[in-house]
C-alpha cells in the first residue's frame, strides 16, 4: 500500500503528469457546459498533496471553466465521498467514471452521467448502464 501511494505521489510530481493532455474534445465540451451552468466544480478523488499540480493543469487546459476544485482524498482516512460533496453543494448533476458514485448520486436525485471511456477505449472498471456515456 505504501509503495502504491509513493508511486501515485511521484507521478503527480513528474514531467509525465505535467505533459498530460485532456481527452480529445473535453476542453470544448466543458466550455459548452460552462455557457449553461451557474457553477461548475471539479470533484476528484485525488489527495490534497496533488492540489497545486492539479490546479496548474486545470488553469492551463480549462481556463475560467471551473469555480472550484474539491479533493476527496480517496483511499485515505480523510476521504469524503463524492455524493456527500454533491449534496452539500446542492449540485444537480455530476459526470464521473465510477458507476458507484453515479448510483449514489442518482439515489439523491442528482443527475449522473457515467463516463465509461472514449474513442475505442473502455475503462476496465466501467459498468454498462443507462447512465453510461463516452466522450465521443
Regions found by a protein language model. Name each.
Residues 1-14:
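Conserved phosphoryl-transfer catalytic core
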Residues 45-95, 99-102:
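Substrate-recognition "cap/lid" segment bordering the active-site pocket of phosphatases
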Residues 30-34, 87, 102, 106:
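Surface-exposed amphipathic alpha-helices with a cationic face
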Residues 91-135:
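Acidic, Mg2+-coordinating phosphoryl-transfer loop and its flanking beta/alpha structural elements
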Residues 15-18, 77-78, 130:
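Pocket-edge positions in alpha/beta enzyme catalytic cores
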Residues 17-21, 26-57, 69-72:
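Substrate-recognition element of Asp-dependent hydrolases with the DxDx(T/V) motif
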Amino acid at each position: 500500500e505504501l509503495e502504491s501511494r509513493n508511486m501515485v505521489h511521484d507521478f503527480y510530481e513528474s514531467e509525465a503528469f505535467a505533459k498530460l493532455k485532456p481527452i480529445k474534445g473535453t476542453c470544448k465540451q466543458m466550455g459548452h457546459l460552462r455557457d449553461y451552468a451557474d457553477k461548475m466544480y471539479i470533484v476528484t478523488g485525488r489527495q490534497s498533496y496533488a492540489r497545486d499540480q492539479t490546479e496548474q493543469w486545470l488553469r492551463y487546459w480549462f481556463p475560467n471553466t471551473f469555480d472550484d476544485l474539491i479533493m476527496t482524498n480517496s483511499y485515505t482516512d480523510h476521504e469524503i465521498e463524492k455524493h456527500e460533496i454533491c449534496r452539500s453543494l446542492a449540485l444537480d448533476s455530476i459526470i464521473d467514471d465510477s458507476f458507484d458514485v453515479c448510483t449514489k448520486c442518482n439515489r439523491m436525485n442528482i443527475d449522473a452521467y457515467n463516463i465509461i471511456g472514449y474513442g475505442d477505449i473502455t475503462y476496465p472498471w466501467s459498468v454498462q448502464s443507462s447512465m453510461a456515456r463516452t466522450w465521443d
